[in-house]
């Protein structure tokens, strides 16, 4: 018997100028079972949420001196099996923070420390290179911010979709936002990919389906028309993205900003239903 309970953790929007104290808030208010498949003894649940709200101003004596803000709100998924819980924890640490063989808590701390150190180094280099005072580098363009949030939901076949959204501003015309995904098997905590659910040799056919779906979504009859409206696509079709989720009704393929279109398009989501994929599914 398959049981699906979906929890979506809403994104945290943060005001850059707000005063926050650095904290590691471990919340248990979201505790729930996400999915049970094939056996009622195999469960993944939301253990807690790691929350960080941290700011650092380069020079507190100057009101508009450059500053950095870091907002993190990410759920920790656990299993009844301690070894699986450890595997999940390290997998997320590697996926989100590129910290190998590290716990998620430790990876968060290292991320915050490194970003603040890099920010201070960057501002110091600006001052030293230009021979100016810190007051010459006030304003939005010299402020940094990092926001990391995550959504967790159960989907097709009881698999657990874990989607991370990162918002980054390190100077420039606008911030950048991108998503990364990972899918867990609730039975053993292993990751699940397209290779696990689609038949060998699926890539050419999947590329064709995605290309057709993209053209339909933007009312383009040909690849040339798609190119004319700004999409980055050639005669071989749209590439298969590395980020996707197994929804209840279909696979959602996620193209981050700049992957297949200019910034103004934002992220592009293409959904192929399982009926559309029936010839490719194992």
Locations of regions flagged by a protein language model:
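Sec-dependent signal peptide recognition
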Residues: 2-8
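Bacterial N-terminal signal peptides
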Residues: 9-15
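Compositionally biased intrinsically disordered regions enriched in Thr/Gly
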Residues: 21-282
């Amino acid at each position: 018997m398959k049981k699906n309970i979906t929890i979506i953790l809403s994104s945290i929007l943060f005001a850059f100028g707000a005063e926050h104290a650095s904290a590691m808030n471990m919340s248990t208010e979201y505790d729930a079972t996400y999915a049970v498949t094939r056996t009622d003894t195999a469960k993944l649940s939301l253990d807690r949420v790691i929350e960080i709200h941290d700011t650092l101003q380069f020079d507190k004596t100057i009101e508009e001196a450059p500053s950095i803000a870091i907002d993190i709100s990410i759920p920790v998924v656990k299993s009844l099996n301690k070894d699986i819980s450890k595997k999940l924890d390290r997998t997320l640490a590697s996926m989100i923070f590129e910290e190998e063989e590290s716990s998620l808590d430790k990876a968060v701390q290292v991320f915050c420390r490194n970003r603040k150190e890099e920010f201070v180094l960057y501002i110091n280099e600006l001052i030293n290179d230009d021979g100016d005072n810190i007051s010459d580098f006030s304003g939005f363009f010299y402020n940094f911010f990092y926001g990391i949030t995550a959504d967790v939901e159960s989907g097709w076949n009881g698999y657990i979709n874990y989607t991370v959204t990162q918002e980054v501003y390190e100077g420039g015309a606008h911030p950048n936002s991108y998503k990364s995904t990972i899918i867990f098997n609730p039975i053993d905590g292993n990751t699940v990919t397209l290779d696990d659910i689609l038949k060998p040799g699926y890539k050419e056919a999947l590329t064709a389906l995605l290309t057709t779906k993209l053209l339909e979504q933007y009312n383009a009859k040909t690849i040339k028309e798609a190119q004319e409206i700004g999409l980055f696509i050639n005669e071989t079709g749209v590439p298969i993205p590395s980020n996707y989720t197994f929804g209840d009704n279909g696979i959602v393929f996620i193209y981050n900003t700049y992957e297949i279109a200019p910034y103004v398009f934002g992220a592009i989501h293409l959904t192929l239903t399982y009926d559309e994929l029936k010839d490719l599914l194992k």
